[in-house]
Structure formats: C-alpha cells, structure tokens
C-alpha cells in the first residue's frame, strides 16, 4: 500500500489480514485488470484502489500489523495522503476539524493547508516548549501567502472551548500548550508565531535574544560575521548560546537564563554592552541605529527588541514569505559561509529532524549562571 507524499507515492507497507474470500477475489481481479508491469511475483498497478486499514503503529514510514477494513470507493487515490494519515491518527480534541485541506498556501514548493497543518503536528514536539505559557501573537494569511495578512492577539469568539487564554492589557491572548491548539491555529492559517521573552506568570525574562538584521538578503554574510563574533564573546564568559536563522533575512541568537535570575533592566546591561562592543570593533559593518535610512549598508544589532512587551519569532515557526521558510535552530558549526536562509523550508526541516537531533534540545536545561556575574561586573564598572 502507498500514500501520496508531495508529488510522489510513498510505499507504506502491506496487508493481507482482514480480507474475506470475496473481497480478496475482487482485489485480485482489479489488480490483474490494471497491472502495468510484473517483476517476479509482484504486479505493479497505477494508483487507483483506495482501502481503509487498521494498523498498530507507524515506524520509519511503515505501517505495522495492518488489517483490511473496507474498500473506499467514494475516495480518489490522490486524497490518500501521508499528511492526512498523520493528522488522522493524532489524539486530538473532538471539536478540531481541518477545513479546506487543499487550499494552496505556498506555490513553490507546493504546500497546501493539509501539508502545513501536518508540518505543525510533526514539529510540535520541538515547537511547543517555546510556546508554553507565553502570550501568543500570530500573523494569519487566510488566503495563502499571496493574500492579505494580519496580526492576531485576541482569541476569536468562534474559537472552540479547548482554546485557553490569558487576559493581558485588554487582550485575550491564546496560550498554546498542546497540539490541538497549535493545529487549530494552523487551520486558521496562522503562519507566523511570535512569542514574548517571558511566561505569562512571570515579570522577568527566561531568555535573551539578539536579532541580527542585515540591510538586505545579499548582506546575509554580515549576520554570519556578527553571530560568530558574538559566539567568541559568549564562549569566553562560559555563556551557552543557540543560533537560529530567522526564516526572513537574518540570524537570531538565543541565550536561556534561569527564571527570575535577571530583570529586563539587568539583561539590557548585557545586551547593550555586547552591541556597543561590536559596533566599536566593526563600525563599518554593524550599527545600533534604529532608523533604517541612517544604517547604510550596515547590519542592525537589535538589542532594543529584547524588552518587556516585545516578541520574537518562535523557533520552528514558518514565515509568511514567498518560500515556506522556517525559523530554524542551528548548530554553531553550521554558521559559516555556506549557510543560506532559503535552504530551511518546511520539507527540508522535517527531513533534517528525521536524520538529526534538534540543536536546541538542551535549551531549557541551561541556566547560564555566569551571565549574572558578568552583568554585576559590567554594572560595577559603569558605576566607577
């Protein structure tokens, strides 16, 4: 048996149990009538016969212990997709339904709504820890990437009952702590997921993020240079840092910190120190000038964005760009001259995680206690 995956047919295993004598005879006749080639005892036919199967599990894209249930004569073979199988076998809230699965979101590579929601399901293990207990802002593209978009902070009135919220400054922010909520948002075509630097229960950040924003896509090498210079500094102070491509045109550096170990004012001491050090060392390459017209061809080191009430794109969030790019965590050895943002699309990221671990898998285990000491020393020097 096989399933449609993008433009290919993915072989998913086989079945023999569950067929009655009559059903087996019907199936054999259909195969004989439509066979294209034969290799040994194996007969090959074009896709066309749809069946419902019961199975135990999916392992390495293979179904195990499959059992025939029924022929599905009302379905076309191209409706039988791997994404549909993955979504159909999740333990989700009953109120959650996928609407308009064939709606086109990206044209090249072709990704429809079903494939996008399937991406969210497959990436949820890695993405949900960063969304957990944070006031979520999304950017929705209800008619696909080529259509209009808008920011959404409030839970809409029509949201199902399982969508949880927290009130903050007059907004009912959605709290995305589970797969059902994430997939409901995906079905609403929330393409971008922006998160604050703190949980809703806290007043202080649980991470620091530097946003390295080159003036244009061609200046991406400046982001690579800035990131590597930052790593040298962080390593010298035993600060554990994690880079990610933004999915747009830059690189972002995440630094996890212990909850309530630092205030926003204290983290500003550190971010300002790093930014000013780099622009003094490389004045022709980097700037902290907020007005774009005054930056010239220099990369903007955005340390101001790390503040209460501000947000950053969530790791593994898709971006509302022409290509289905993803804000993808990197290993530091990947931050080199070969790095290209456009490489990190939905299909690439899923394949990457099938064959490698997540670069941020230890993120929430880090406390970076040395950062507290460093900030104290910087403040002490400034007071002299």
Each predicted region: which residue ranges?
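Short conserved beta-strand segments at catalytic cores or DNA/RNA-binding microdomains
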Residues: 1-6
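Helical (often loop-to-helix) elements that flank the catalytic cores of nucleotide-handling enzymes
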Residues: 7-28, 158-167, 219-235, 255-285, ...
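C-terminal accessory nucleic-acid interaction domains of nucleic acid-metabolism proteins
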Residues: 26, 30, 34-118, 125-133, ...
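Short N-terminal amphipathic alpha-helices
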Residues: 127-143, 149
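Short beta-strand
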Residues: 138-142, 241-248, 288-293
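A contiguous, low-structure linker/loop signature
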Residues: 148-202
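Signature for HUH/AEP ssDNA processing cores
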Residues: 180-246, 257-261, 265
